[in-house]
Amino acid sequence: GVLKVRLEELNLEVLQPYLKRRERLSGHVKGEFKADWDIDKNVIPNADWAFDADGLAYSTRVDGGRLPVTLEALRLTGTVRPEHAVLGWTVKPEGTGGVEGNLTIEDPAGERRMKGRVVVSDMTPVLLKPLLSKGERAEGVFAADLTAGGTLEAPRIWGDVTLKGVELDAGFVPFEMNPSEIALRFEGDRSTLTGRISTAEGDLVLDGRASWPTAEDWT
């Protein structure tokens, strides 16, 4: 069989009737999906897709205020073959950093080996600021550089996740957080957490470890 789907500047407002009354969605999506298959030869089809969204905006009401999320860029790509599957994505929120990544699954019907990378660049809590009242603040920078390996049954992750210069003073948290640092390091099937959360009453020192020999240990 063969299937081809092409989107030419699809206006996402057509989905508005299916959303809750407090939700709003706008923007345009374009892209293409192609697939062909022969189940007598292989149960895994051949497929390719690429979708781009421009000016994607979503908002909902939270505690009486409107929380908007606007993406300057959103791109999703993928390829599926009997021998491998590849996913890719780029997400760029308005007014802050972005997220890029890719993931490959080799031998998806057998060993399902993984390899990939996710990079988060200079993300700030800009999305929280519409929820803040006058005098409240939320600052900090979130970054990550992670690589994946192993298999779906025994995943492995390497790299670092950091939160730097975190300051939070808002009604939805029980204390005021002064400049604080948190770091998470992944080393295959284990990770370490370090950091210091500073408050007016004192500091909270973070020090922890975790491991996951198999995927079942994630649950």
What are these regions (language model features)?
Residues 1-219:
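Interface amphipathic segments
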